[in-house]
């Protein structure tokens, strides 16, 4: 199963976990969003902090998502995006 299909199938679980950890407005970017992921690709998620983040944020969210998906996950907070990569990340980003 492609990673993109897995994200679509687990969308509600992913959004629930994000909210539990104080995150929202979840977008996928990188190879998965472009449709050129490989079996060893990680899942790149762009998020906003929408509530009160947990004390281990975003590490706890990453751990929960990796357990759920069985894939490596990278979480990037939108407001923390470096200007060096901002344009390319936002160009790729698509709503979960």
Model region roles, listed by residue range:
Residues 1-27, 33-39, 50-96:
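Catalytic core of pol beta-like nucleotidyltransferases
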